[in-house]
Structure formats: structure tokens, C-alpha cells
From Swiss-Prot:
MF terms in GO: NADH dehydrogenase (ubiquinone) activity
Keyword ATP-binding carried by entry: no
Subcellular location: Mitochondrion membrane
InterPro entries from the UniProt entry: NADH_UbQ/plastoQ_OxRdtase_su3, NDAH_ubi_oxred_su3_sf
Record's protein name: NADH-ubiquinone oxidoreductase chain 3
Organism field: Heterololigo bleekeri
Uppermost EC category: translocase
Length: 117
């Protein structure tokens, strides 16, 4: 128990020394603040530099990822269907595909898959 406390004390001392050494060596100046400020042809930028993000693109990308992951989940079912003597793998995969198709038709009816409106 005492050796663990000694190791913890040594680690604490090393951490404090490294922290203080970093604070002493660190040089912050006015030029660092200027380097981090926006610069555009000698003037501050008049508009926000970030481009607007299309929410329709984000929604389409999320839908694509969801269906992509679901297809990856379907791939092992093919070997289960071929190697099984029961109808359970086929039934479960049909239920899963039905749920996928219902979700796809719902997204289609909501207009989430239409890129241009």
C-alpha cells in the first residue's frame, strides 16, 4: 500500500513539474492573437466564412447511412437461410425487409428523398 502511495506521489510531482515547465516556457504575445484573427485582403471579413449547410443533404445522408447499415445487417442472413433447416431465418429476414420497405415508403411520402423542390 505504501509503495502505491509513493508511486502516486512521484507521478503527481512529475505532472506538476511538467505543467509548470510548460507554463514557464510558453510564450504568448500580441502576434499570436493577430495570427489567430481572420484576415481577408487586409480587412476583417465582412461576412461569415462558413458556408450554409443544406439540411436536405444532411437528412438524405442520414437516411443513406441507416439503410446502408441495415443492408450490412442483412448480409449474414443469407448464410443462415442456406444453412438452416427451419424457416425462422427466412421469416425474420422477410419481417426485417418489410420494416425496411415501410420505412422507405414513409420517407418517400414525407418528401425526404426528393432532392429538388
Amino acid at each position: 500500500m505504501v509503495t502505491i502511495l509513493i508511486y502516486l506521489l512521484i507521478l503527481l510531482i512529475i505532472n506538476v513539474v511538467l505543467l509548470l515547465l510548460g507554463l514557464i516556457i510558453n510564450k504568448r504575445s500580441y502576434s499570436d492573437r493577430e495570427k489567430n484573427s481572420p484576415f481577408e485582403c487586409g480587412f476583417d471579413p465582412s461576412i461569415h466564412t462558413r458556408a450554409p449547410f443544406s439540411m436536405r443533404f444532411f437528412l438524405l445522408a442520414v437516411i443513406f447511412l441507416i439503410f446502408d447499415v441495415e443492408i450490412i445487417l442483412l448480409l449474414p442472413l443469407t448464410s443462415n437461410i442456406l444453412n438452416s433447416n427451419t424457416h425462422w431465418p427466412l421469416t425474420s429476414s422477410m419481417i426485417f425487409l418489410t420494416i425496411l420497405l415501410i420505412g422507405l415508403f414513409h420517407e418517400w411520402n414525407q418528401g425526404s428523398l426528393d432532392w429538388m423542390k
